[in-house]
């Protein structure tokens, strides 16, 4: 896992040069949005269970996946889905704080699509639930922070699609 600062510095270091104007601008933007990201992470942390619960209600609860024969029908499968959605929310929050999506590749996406396909987990329902998490989160943290968080939730969706 790296953060935006490490990414900028590593890029310059690999090239053997000092930070240029574009690199400095990336750092300025990262620091300027720091308070917003920390406040959003605090709200998300305090409301994570509610965010996941509302997202499931919006996207999955009354769909075919929760009916008999659906992929989330048994209590065990439903609990696994809730666990996974909480996991995505948590790691997207980490990525937002770091200003870098690399943790999502390392700890969430590597092999996830293949695992879901082998287990018969419907990717489209998962993506729909993550999009619902994005909506619920934005309603709690506000438009600007919601947009920032949305970048990382969309990244997960893209990685699954």
UniProtKB/Swiss-Prot annotation:
<dbReference type="Pfam" id="PF00502">
    <property type="entry name" value="Phycobilisome"/>
</dbReference>
<feature type="binding site" description="covalent">
    <location>
        <position position="81"/>
    </location>
    <ligand>
        <name>(2R,3E)-phycocyanobilin</name>
    </ligand>
</feature>
<keyword id="KW-0813">Transport</keyword>
<dbReference type="GO" id="GO:0031676">
    <property type="term" value="C:plasma membrane-derived thylakoid membrane"/>
</dbReference>
<keyword id="KW-0605">Phycobilisome</keyword>
<comment type="similarity">
    <text>Belongs to the phycobiliprotein family.</text>
</comment>
<keyword id="KW-0602">Photosynthesis</keyword>
<dbReference type="GO" id="GO:0030089">
    <property type="term" value="C:phycobilisome"/>
</dbReference>
<keyword id="KW-0157">Chromophore</keyword>
<dbReference type="InterPro" id="IPR006245">
    <property type="entry name" value="Allophycocyanin_b"/>
</dbReference>
<keyword id="KW-0249">Electron transport</keyword>
<dbReference type="InterPro" id="IPR012128">
    <property type="entry name" value="Phycobilisome_asu/bsu"/>
</dbReference>
<feature type="modified residue" description="N4-methylasparagine">
    <location>
        <position position="71"/>
    </location>
</feature>
<keyword id="KW-0793">Thylakoid</keyword>
<dbReference type="GO" id="GO:0015979">
    <property type="term" value="P:photosynthesis"/>
</dbReference>
<keyword id="KW-0042">Antenna complex</keyword>
<keyword id="KW-0472">Membrane</keyword>
<comment type="subunit">
    <text>Heterodimer of an alpha and a beta chain.</text>
</comment>
<dbReference type="InterPro" id="IPR038719">
    <property type="entry name" value="Phycobilisome_asu/bsu_sf"/>
</dbReference>
<keyword id="KW-0089">Bile pigment</keyword>
<dbReference type="InterPro" id="IPR009050">
    <property type="entry name" value="Globin-like_sf"/>
</dbReference>
<comment type="function">
    <text>Light-harvesting photosynthetic bile pigment-protein from the phycobiliprotein complex. Allophycocyanin has a maximum absorption at approximately 650 nanometers.</text>
</comment>
<keyword id="KW-0488">Methylation</keyword>
<protein>
    <recommendedName>
        <fullName>Allophycocyanin beta chain</fullName>
    </recommendedName>
</protein>
